Amino acid sequence: MPVDSRRLQGPESAFSYTLLEKKDANAEESILSADMQKMLIDSKQIRKDKRKPTDARPLFLRTGIISQAKGSAYIEQGNTKLVCGVYGPREVQKKSDFRLNGQLFCEFKFAPFSCQKRRSHQQDNEELVLSGLLREALEAAVCLHHFPKAQVEVNVMVIENDGSPLAAALTCASLALSSASIPMYDLVVGASVRQLPKVLLLDPTKDEEWQPELSHDQNNSNLTVGYMPSMQQVCAYVHEGVSNTEDLEQMLKLVTEYCLKVQPIVQLCLKETVEKMLANEGENKDAE
Amino acid sequence: MAEILLSEAEKAFIHHGVQDDLRCDGRTRLDYRPIILETGLVSNASGSSRLRLANSDVLVGVKVELASPLPEKPLEGRLEFFVDCSANATPEFEGRGGEDLANEICRFLQMSYMSGDTINLAELSVLAGQQCWVLYVDILILECGGNLYDTVSLAVKSALYTTQIPSIKVATMDGDQPELELSEDPYDTKRLNTQNVPCLVTLMKIGNHYLVDPTPEEECCSSSGVVVAVSGTKKITAVRKIGSGSLHPESLVSMLKTASEVGAVVNKILMKTLLEEERAGKTQKVGFMR
């Protein structure tokens, strides 16, 4: 990606045509939580995509998707699709960063066409913060002391963003890291939950996610958690919106229970990867 | 966060102190260091404040300007944050070193201000869909002595409290073009309601306990913590886990509960102090001489 770091581009005058959409009067008033809830979930507690509030979207995982990378993984969580590539351990690129423990460099990027509103091809502030969050979460899981003076690069590219990109990135990155044979304490499983005044929605889609623009109400928020199920440790925690501490406790419990259920799926994918790698090695030895 | 090198013995000393609820400087685990606050220092800014939390020094200036509102939100004004970690604060911020931290603080502030009804942005609208007030909140980190998130949030809240927004009247002319008239009286201004504006509380975990307002040495001993944005009504508007360690869900929940209690107290004391300063009137400014 050509990155021009010397010039500051002025603001673009182009804007999305969806702003010209005629909004009906009902939509204008439904900033209130009660109507928002009606929009997302009907009286029988079924969401727009026919899920129950505590149902997550179907998960698809595959490793070895980038042949040149040391390890890679692809995740599909409903319509959210992202790819993660892991390179390393290799020598630290910047000479000043010389540490006794290994270092992790994470890059989180939305493809320009991945979201409803076009993203710039350079990392903007939101992506930089998400990269930092991803790095801090993975640093808790990776055994950094196993590769001193070296660095591992984790690159996440979101191909389609339909809600919970950070949660999917956490799961995908830890799968990619483990398939790259980077020593880790535990797999990180990411999950997110949307809080509405009377119900919690697990694994929200983009439409269900809390938007800072729309909701100005109490008890409306979004929580993304990165959890290490075997060690029972939370390594990433991001909450946005207005909540009470009691609600936060409930949301955390829901998310950790979900992560425990997802862990065997990730482990199964990893097991199949290892079996395939061993089978390939066996074939190569036979060929020799 | 200048290069803090602690020996194992020093780290053990801090750990034991925290266990006994007696930190190196004599505080308990939930005590803040002394805070010095002064507002209205910068004459060219619509609102300003300087907050010194022990060794952390932050200067905030708020400038109000007229601009067109965002197309998605035609009836609201905006708040734009910018954090500048100057190289004066600590040698690590030299060049572009402080950019990451500045970006994180900026983004977290934006998130915590956008949630809920912390600040009523509809008040900042002048002419629906055409003109609105934009508050540029510029934060200068002059010195870094640990616990930047808290210092910055308290300074920003104080600066917004004292921000004067000029009154503008919309005069409709015969043609379609409405004209904006600025009030002739320079003291005819309005202020924002900052009652619900959140304060950030940082809690770092050391051993089995957590601390409020960590010093740089304590930050070095700790591997993880949370930053919680607590609004005036004791609600939590944003949370982020910081540091490269991990937390058990139960300790995380108890940290959140403590943070909301501490945040409520901090909010109350800050508002009280700001009211007192306002009542004291335009006495001699101490400024940077102290």
Annotated model-derived regions:
Chain A
Residues 1-288:
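Polyanion-binding surfaces on beta-sheet-dominated domains and ring/shell assemblies
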